[in-house]
Structure formats: structure tokens, C-alpha cells
């Protein structure tokens, strides 16, 4: 697949079918949603998104409100919630006024505009065994957008580092894991011939490492000059570290190797402070601490955030990556890859010495003091639980996300995570005990009764 750039002045407009009295199409995919998703994907591939505050909002706001109008009319559960809150396409004047759905509501209601016959995948949250998980339904078009968002967001932050060693089960064993799908997408896009999964499902249906295969792979990687990237959850790395400690073993991975750690512990291992975990990983794998990064995501989203230290370590690549002008595609400065990714190799030669770099000094099992950043088609707001309003810079609140890539679900998501605004990014503090901000209560029973 090649990168198809929008023609100069290209604009996708929608007919007035999103009027207040528009009927909901239940038995086939809505053409307007498909068109919006295709347009958004073109913008991602062409690097048409910008980060500058004023210009970025002028671009993001109309897209967010257009998507809200579509989701209001074609996502029945979401439309009911918005109507109860008095929010309609006619009353919402700015994207920040769009109602957010708590992640807990995804356990009770189907927030989707995809007809059942066209659903090809569903991602579940990784909650406590026996509990109803959150559900995020996908179709071919939504997965294509998800994977474009993933690859376009991952590369500028993390770059390429040869082979991929993935510490999760393969998709066949974990078909409802968005994290496994994420890693498999990276495998197919960046290392289809060399990447391998080294996790498996245990007897208790939990994830565990396939150590008889993993250890020889790490030995071979240590003896090679080709960099390797390890992808895995925090608890998978703890399992690996504990085994290496018991055997008094260490590896020395090649220069340029990296680690992406995500997903938390899920009660699958002992819990380590983030700084201690990363120090142990660096020591046991022979890496510099700067080579270890974090990712923040969830099954309800279609975009991911990465810690800002990753982009700073790459010379500030991510901060400028998304403002490329598509005309460069024909000038030789950019080259399209299979899947439509566009790379500017010159950016990777920039030195990190000229950029400020946040230092990870985590104090608990979350990524405290690691600052995360989403791609420019997603926005983060920190909401005060007491007032329901946006918290000031440096104040603690609940993380609210607005992900345009969630075209066929709900773009505005209220998480249960606490965070602090840090410039254009945020600091993750952990899970809130009382996670619902004022003004965001959701009567699930009422919505269910209105759907019947």
C-alpha cells in the first residue's frame, strides 16, 4: 500500500444529513462515518496534523465537532447519553464541550456504530477475572484507522531498532487484547520477518513467558550487531528479571536496542517502583536507562501516548514530526514505506544534546514523573473531580481523552486515571479511588431502558 496524499486544498464535507432529525442507520455501516475515517487516515499519513496551540485547535476543533455530530446520530447509546446531558450538535460550540463517556460504562453498554454483522474484532479491558470487561468493537475500517494511528504515533517517538522481541502471547491466544493487537501491528509493519512472540497463556489463563524460547533468542541477540526492541508489560519484565536473578544471568544487547514497557502489573507479579524496574531492566539487558520507555493506552482508545523522553532522546523528532508539509513527499526528503508510513531520515540525525529531556524518577508502580504525549489527533484534559472543570497547569485531576481515531466508537473518554498537565503532555499518577468527576454521572439503567 502506498501513501495517497490529499490533493491541494482537499476538504471533505458532509451533507446536511447530520441534522437533528436524521434517522439512525442500524443495519449497514454509515457512509459518512466511513468517509470521515478515510479522510482522517489521509491526514495522518500526509502529516497534515499540527501541534502549535492556536493552529492545532483550529484544525482539531472542527474535526472533533463533525465527528461528534456523526457519533451523536449513529451511535445509539452515546446519542442517548448526550441527549440526557443536553448536548447536541447544535449546542456544542467547542470540542471541549463534547460529553465524555466513563470507561466503566463500556462494560455495560455497546458504544459502537458498527452493526453486529460487520464487527470483525472486539477488544476487552484487562480487568479482574470474572468481572465484565469493557468492550471496544471494530470492523475493517476501524482497524485500518487504528493501525495507521498506531504506526504514525509509534515511529516518531520510538523509531526503529531491528528485530522485535514481544513478551506477550500471540494474537491467536489473546484475540481480545488490544495490546497484543498493537504489538502484532508493529510486528507486521516494522519487522515482519524477524519479530516473534515469546509469551503464552498459562494454566490459569494468565500471561507467562516462554522462557525456553526467549532465553536463546536473547542470547542470539546479544551476539548480533543488529539492535533489538523488547515490547512487553511491566509484569512480564518482572518475570524475566526474577528468572535472570535466580540464574545469575545477564545479557548485553547491541547498541541501539530499546525496551517499551507498558500495561502495569495486573496482580501478575510483585510490584516495583518504576525507577527500580527500569534500572533492573537496564542492568540485566545491558542498556542505558534512556533506552527504556513507557506507553500509555487502553482498550477503549485507538491512539497511544508515549513518554516524552523517547522523542527527546531521538533529537526532538516527535515534536516536529507531524507538521511535515506533504509537498516534501515528492522532493526526495521523505520516502513512503509499505503501509503508507513516511520517514525523514535527516530528522534522526539530530542530536539529543540540543533538546530538553525529562528524567524518569518514578516513585510508585505508575509512570510518575514520566511525561506522556499523544499524537496530535488526540487531546488530553485534566479534569478536577470536585468542579468538573479543567485543572490548571500542575494541578492533579482525572485524565480525560479525546481521540479522533475512535471514529466508530466514542471520541471523548473519561478515564479513571489521575494525572497532572505538563505543557503539551501529562504526568500519570495512578488510578483514582473515586474516579467519576462532578457532572459526569451516567445512569446506565436509564440509557438501557431508552434503548429497548
Predicted features along the sequence, with ranges:
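Short polybasic/polar patches that bind polyanions
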Residues: 83, 141, 283
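A conserved hydrophobic position in a structured secondary element of the catalytic/binding core
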Residues: 20, 73, 232
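Active-site diphosphate/adenylate-binding microenvironment
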Residues: 54, 58, 70-73, 77-124, ...
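Intrinsic disorder/low-complexity segments
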Residues: 1-28, 314-368
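Active-site glycine/GP-rich loop and adjacent strand/helix microenvironment
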Residues: 25-44, 58-70, 162-163, 167-170, ...
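Conserved adenylate-forming
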Residues: 126-174
Amino acid at each position: 500500500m502506498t501513501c495517497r496524499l490529499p490533493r491541494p486544498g482537499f476538504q471533505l464535507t458532509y451533507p446536511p444529513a447530520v441534522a437533528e432529525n436524521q434517522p439512525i442507520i442500524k443495519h449497514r455501516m454509515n457512509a459518512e462515518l466511513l468517509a470521515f475515517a478515510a479522510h482522517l487516515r489521509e491526514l495522518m499519513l500526509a502529516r497534515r496534523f499540527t501541534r502549535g496551540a492556536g493552529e492545532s485547535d483550529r484544525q482539531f476543533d472542527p474535526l472533533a465537532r463533525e465527528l461528534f455530530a456523526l457519533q451523536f446520530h449513529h451511535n445509539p447509546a452515546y446519542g442517548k447519553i448526550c441527549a440526557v446531558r443536553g448536548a447536541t450538535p447544535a449546542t456544542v460550540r467547542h470540542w471541549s464541550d463534547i460529553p465524555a463517556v466513563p470507561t466503566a460504562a463500556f462494560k455495560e453498554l455497546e458504544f459502537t456504530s458498527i452493526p453486529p454483522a460487520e464487527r470483525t474484532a472486539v477488544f476487552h479491558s484487562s480487568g479482574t477475572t470474572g468481572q465484565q470487561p469493557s468492550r471496544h468493537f471494530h470492523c475493517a475500517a476501524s482497524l485500518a484507522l487504528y493501525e495507521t494511528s498506531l504506526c504514525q504515533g509509534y515511529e516518531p517517538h520510538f523509531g526503529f531498532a531491528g528485530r522485535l522481541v514481544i513478551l506477550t502471547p500471540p494474537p491467536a491466544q489473546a484475540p481480545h487484547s488490544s495490546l497484543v493487537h498493537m504489538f502484532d501491528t508493529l510486528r507486521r509493519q516494522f519487522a515482519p520477518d524477524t519479530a516473534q512472540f515469546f509469551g503464552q497463556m498459562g494454566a490459569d489463563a494468565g500471561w507467562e513467558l516462554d522462557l525456553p524460547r526467549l532465553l536463546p533468542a536473547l542470547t542470539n541477540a546479544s551476539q548480533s550487531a543488529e539492535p533489538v526492541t523488547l515490547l512487553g508489560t511491566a509484569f512480564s519484565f518482572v518475570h524475566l528479571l526474577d528468572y535472570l536473578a535466580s540464574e545469575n544471568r545477564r545479557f548485553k544487547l547491541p547498541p541501539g536496542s530499546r525496551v517499551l514497557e507498558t500495561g502495569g502489573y495486573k496482580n501478575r507479579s510483585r510490584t516495583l517502583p518504576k525507577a527500580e524496574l527500569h534500572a533492573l531492566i537496564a542492568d540485566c539487558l545491558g542498556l542505558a536507562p534512556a533506552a527504556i520507555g513507557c506507553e500509555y493506552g487502553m482498550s477503549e482508545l485507538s491512539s497511544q501516548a508515549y513518554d516524552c523522553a523517547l522523542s527527546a532522546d531521538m533529537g526532538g523528532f516527535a515534536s516536529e514530526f507531524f507538521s511535515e508539509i506533504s509537498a516534501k513527499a515528492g522532493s526526495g526528503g521523505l520516502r513512503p514505506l509499505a503501509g503508507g508510513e513516511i520517514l525523514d531520515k535527516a530528522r534522526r540525525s539530530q542530536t539529543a544534546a540540543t533538546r530538553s529531556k525529562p528524567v524518569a524518577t518514578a516513585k510508585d508502580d505508575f509512570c510518575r514523573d514520566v511525561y506522556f504525549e499523544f499524537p496530535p489527533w488526540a487531546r488530553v484534559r485534566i479534569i478536577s473531580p470536585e468542579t468538573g472543570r479543567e485543572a490548571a497547569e500542575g494541578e492533579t485531576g482525572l485524565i480525560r481523552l479525546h481521540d479522533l481515531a475512535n471514529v466508530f466508537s466514542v471520541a471523548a473518554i473519561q478515564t479513571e486515571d489521575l494525572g497532572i498537565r505538563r505543557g503539551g503532555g501529562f504526568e500519570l499518577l495512578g488510578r483514582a479511588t473515586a474516579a467519576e468527576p462532578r457532572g459526569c454521572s451516567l445512569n446506565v439503567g436509564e440509557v438501557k431502558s431508552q434503548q429497548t
